[in-house]
Each structure stands twice: as C-alpha cells, then as structure tokens.
A protein has these predicted regions:
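Polybasic/polar functional segments that serve as interface/processing modules
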Residues: 1-77
Length: 77
C-alpha cells in the first residue's frame, strides 16, 4: 500500500494517476453506458472517479472525490 493524500495524488499526470490506481487502487464501483465507462476506486482513505470515453477509447478523467455527495452521485448514476 502507498501512503498518499488527495492533494499529492492531484500532482500526478493523468498517466501517473492511472498507474497508481493500477498498482494500489481497489475498484469499488463500475458502470458502463453505451458511450462511457465509470469506475470509482478506493486509494488509501479517499476515492477516485475514473471516466473513460468508449468511442474514443481514452480516459477523460481520473480525479479524487472530495465530498460524500460526489461519491453518492457516482453510485446513483
């Protein structure tokens, strides 16, 4: 396990963020729609939302969730 904070995680490039999730993240939620794939990962004591555009086959975002409301939003989609 890696000891990293949300702020430290934000300093990494998108490629670095995804690598950290590959190595140390735990997938807790995943949803696939016709155009997008959304995943929520747990990394240490915070969650990270990853959004992938399936048409372009590229990751759009890998950002930490700062509030419980954001986490609930992803689970309710």
């Amino acid at each position: 396990m890696i000891n990293i904070t949300r702020v430290e995680y934000c300093r990494f490039s998108l490629k670095g963020r995804l690598r950290l999730l590959d190595l140390f993240g735990e997938l807790v939620f995943e949803k696939i729609t016709p155009n997008r794939e959304m995943g929520v990962f747990k990394l240490n004591d915070f969650y990270v939302a990853v959004i992938k555009d399936l048409e372009m086959n590229s990751v759009i975002e890998a950002s930490p969730l700062w509030t419980v409301d954001q986490l609930q939003f992803y689970f309710s989609q």
